[in-house]
Amino acid sequence: MCGIAGVVSTIRESNITEALVHHMCEQIVYRGPDDEGIYVADGAGLGMRRLSIIDLSGGHQPVFNEDRTAWIVYNGEIYNFPELRAQLEGRGHHFYTHTDTEVIIHLYEDLGADCVTKLRGMFALAIYDKTKRKLVLARDRLGKKPLHYALHKGNLYFASEIKSILSVAPELAEVNAQALLEYLYYGYVPDPITAFTGIHKLPPGHLLEFQDGKIHTRQYWELPEYNTHAPKSEEECLEELEQRLLEATKIRLISDVPLGAFLSGGTDSSTIVALMARASSGPVKTFSIGFKKDDFNEANWARIVAKKFNTDHHEMILDPDVVQTVEHLTSSLEEPFGDSSMLPTYYVSQMARQHVTVALSGDGGDEMFAGYDRYRIHEGRRVFEHIPGWARRLFRDQIFPRLPNRMQGRKFSYNVSLPWQERYIDHLAFLPAFERDTPLLSDDFREILDRGDDPANVLRRYFAQAPAKDPIDQLLYVDTKTYLVADILTKVDRMSMLNSLEVRVPILDHLVVEWVAGLPPEWKLRGKQQKYILRKLAERVGVPREVLYRQKQGFSLPLVHWMRNELKDMLMILLEPRTLERGYFAADGVRKLMDDHLVRGRTMTGRIWRLLMFELWHRNFLEKYVKPAGLHSLPVVADSRRQSPRSPSAKDALASVPVGG
């Protein structure tokens, strides 16, 4: 596991130096504290920071082929590299190390950029081909590892994290208004844009080739068609799933350093621990956290699973300095990020790193097996589709606007009047379209956003291209392309890497993902039972039923309590002149939101947290590059790369950002 960074110029005699590449690498030392390597020649510079996992003494990068005409830096783990190496040796290739990195560069010699289609694992890589003066960038199929790039003044910059690019090209710190809008809508910035107009994310499953000053990107992998194979019986389905997931877990146990697993006591992590216990010769090291407030302490469930599988269990009940943690995380995150579960992810990574260098997790189970409540809720509301369209439109356009604003079920009433895909989008939105209360966005900010794209179009485009007919399968596809990548996997990567910990995700092995996608949706969501077949597998491998059929909580944390106590003073920055003078939000709207939460007792946690993360990102990250940062620093026209002919404007979508919850 590493962090990578570099730059390739169209000019052979450019001023790319080792010092410049070193400076880029310095920004991400925590991603690889064990080693640094740099290659500079002919207008190209590649750099890496290494966290040693495999071949501890021989894993230095960059790595080259036999005649040193191709060089690679790479972040990730390739689990099928022993088989690939044997094939390459059979074709006459010679190796000097036992690393997966060297396998990739020899595979590139044989197959060119398409070599990535042979890789099984997680990766973000950069290959410089001296003969062709070409740079190849590639990102793994599901987006487990990040990769950013920017073309600026004839130079192609790339890096695991944006801060490496900004450290040598600070003029690229032009804030992307479209990204800010999408953050406020989703709580994250969806691929491929970033918070900076000139810097982009390479999407999962994509290649980029840079040659002669031109960028060419192409997709090398896509989720397959859903619902293509129906098992003859539940037993057959369980046998196949068990074999595939056990094998995906086994290959992720290869390591030359201590290895363990996150254990929350939920279905996903418990299943992975059960499979690890079967595949391991000794006790599995497991890690769980809880909080001192009893309502947010799930450590007892993890304890039950740990006892069942005789793990070497490590547990920590926390009463953290949450203010200090929030300050630290927002100074490290390069984009506003609104998922508060980054806090427990950071804490469990911090604890695990005291004992291991690699941890397996159960991430991906919800998106693959329909684990979120919103899938079940969506299915329940499909009954309203039997109401004629004219009747739903009449209710939405004529009756609904006359209902009392705070009528119980008003949001539900509006939501079920929408077409099913729009209903799901509205359900996800932080800023639901049905509310027209006191606006939160300033008039000036909405005017800028009016030139941009309706953020809901991100999901609409994925719905349009989903290789699925059943609505549940379409929802799983959309979430895999958006929420999984830009929220869940981003969170896991950033929080684990801040602690120099590698996290591996067996459920998101692409062979498992492809097979599970092909299952009929009723194997995932059956009636009200979410993750049906995964729970049955968990029972089969010994996870106690009391763990499997309790209410899902995930990484639970006392955020409401913190925001009325430990974080209360921090929240007050939202009312400071410095914040309001940025020009994004209407002062009256922010004050009402805060009063509702702190004075009237309404739970506005999600919205306030999202605004707090937005402001702290400005203070702790953005203002390193843009001072003062605010509405005045936005470009005149918002990013328009997501425009489509049928796209309503952002202003139409969010004409009045609501304050009420």
Segments predicted by a language model, with ranges:
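Adenosyl-5′-phosphate
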Residues: 1, 41, 167, 198-204, ...
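Cysteine-centered catalytic environments shared across enzyme families
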Residues: 1-333, 345, 349, 540, ...
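Short hydrophobic/aromatic residue motifs in ordered secondary structure
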Residues: 35, 146, 269, 365, ...
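Active-site adenylate/phosphate-handling loop in enzymes that bind or generate adenylated species
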Residues: 141, 347-407, 483, 488, ...
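Short beta-alpha connecting loops at secondary-structure transitions
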Residues: 165, 288-289, 335, 379-387
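Glycine-rich loop motifs involved in handling phospho/adenylate chemistry
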Residues: 259-268, 293-294, 340-343, 368, ...
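Alpha-helix capping and helix-loop boundary segments enriched in small/acidic/polar residues
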Residues: 293, 317, 336-339, 386, ...
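Short secondary-structure boundary/capping segments
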Residues: 330-332, 373-380, 628-629
